[in-house]
Swiss-Prot record:
Belongs to the cyclophilin-type PPIase family. PANTHER family: PEPTIDYL-PROLYL CIS-TRANS ISOMERASE, PEPTIDYL-PROLYL CIS-TRANS ISOMERASE D-RELATED. This is Probable inactive peptidyl-prolyl cis-trans isomerase-like 6. Residues 145-308 form the PPIase cyclophilin-type domain. Pfam families: Pro_isomerase. Probable inactive PPIase with no peptidyl-prolyl cis-trans isomerase activity. GO terms for cellular component: cytoplasm. The lineage of its organism: Eukaryota, Metazoa, Chordata, Craniata, Vertebrata.
């Protein structure tokens, strides 16, 4: 997509006859698991390496899928018509001015700064795979998934990042309930989210599930016994997709959990948040739109499988 472009060196065609006094800085924000992010990253780094006096170090912001969609929606509201139909997995700026996607940045680097990218697409695929593995490993966090269906129709997968460095006990409970490795509790409850349901949807609030006993929303079981204590309240409920433990009062966590649909600061210091949705933007939207009666979904919203997505 052609966009008004920042000025280049004096010999380049540009709306201004001279180079800006301050160096240019390229910013790339995008979906870390997409090759286009690596293409844009390479273009930004090549600009700096080939013209070190003209460019500052680029700002590179890799994002998980859910965070990317949230970021893009915010940018669309901020930039309005300029990006309203924008659908790429990466976005680039030069000195804060919107430039475009990875190909727009690559084109600008070529036409204005004489930089040609000859890397094959297979190399970018390999770079993406290596970068993704390192990106996830460097978080030092655990990850789990829930596969969801509405009635008998599969709608996709939710993937969560668990803040096991902040809430290790709470995260272990959720992780083991996802994998089912604990087997059965002393009272014979199967400690596994598989085949459990989402029993509550609070509009503009949260969706709730995890009653692995009867699915009615009045029971549950942790891997430590019927309940366990509130570990801490370090993670705020400051955005959509926050994962937390539902309870019946202080120190009564079991297996029930919730996923916020927007910032819910009124839950802070009352419920333990311990993770964040990182993939499954459209899945959460579909769950959010299920009609309810007294906050109970009128269609069966079931977890068909759960576990470690990268095992």
């Amino acid at each position: 997509m052609a966009r008004p472009q920042p000025c280049g060196p004096p010999h380049a065609r540009c709306g201004s006859p001279s180079l800006p006094e301050r160096p240019l800085q390229v910013k790339v924000v995008g979906l870390f698991s997409c090759p286009n992010f690596q293409i844009a990253k390479s273009a930004a780094e090549n600009l700096k390496n080939n013209h070190p006096s003209k460019f500052e170090d680029p700002i590179l912001v890799p994002l998980q899928e859910f965070a990317w969609h949230q970021y893009l929606q915010e940018k669309k509201r901020e930039l309005k018509n300029e990006t309203w139909e924008y659908s790429s997995s990466v976005i680039s700026f030069v000195n804060g001015q919107f430039l475009g996607d990875a190909l727009d940045l690559q084109k600008w680097a070529h036409e204005v700064w004489d930089i040609v990218d000859i890397k094959p697409s297979a190399l970018y695929d390999a770079l993406t795979e290596d970068f993704s593995a390192k990106f996830l490993r460097d978080t030092k966090h655990d990850f789990v998934f829930l596969d969801i269906c509405i009635d008998s129709s599969p709608i996709g997968r939710l993937i969560f990042e668990l803040y096991c460095d902040v809430c290790p006990k709470t995260c272990k409970n959720f992780q083991v309930l996802c994998t089912g490795k604990a087997g059965f509790s002393q009272r014979g409850i199967r400690l596994h989210y598989k085949n459990s349901i989402f029993h509550r949807i609070v509009q503009n609030g949260w969706i709730q599930g995890g009653d692995i006993v009867y699915g009615k929303g009045d029971n549950g079981e942790s891997i430590y016994g019927p309940t366990f204590e509130d570990e801490n309240f370090s993670v705020p409920h400051n955005k959509r997709g926050v994962l937390g433990m539902a309870n019946k009062g202080r120190h009564s966590n079991g297996s029930q959990f919730y996923i916020t649909l927007q910032a819910t600061p009124y839950l802070d210091r009352k419920f333990v948040a311990f993770g964040q949705l990182i993939e499954g933007t459209e899945v959460l939207k579909q769950l959010e739109l299920v009609p309810t009666q007294n906050e109970r979904p009128i269609h069966m919203c079931r977890i068909t499988d759960s576990g470690d997505p990268y095992a």
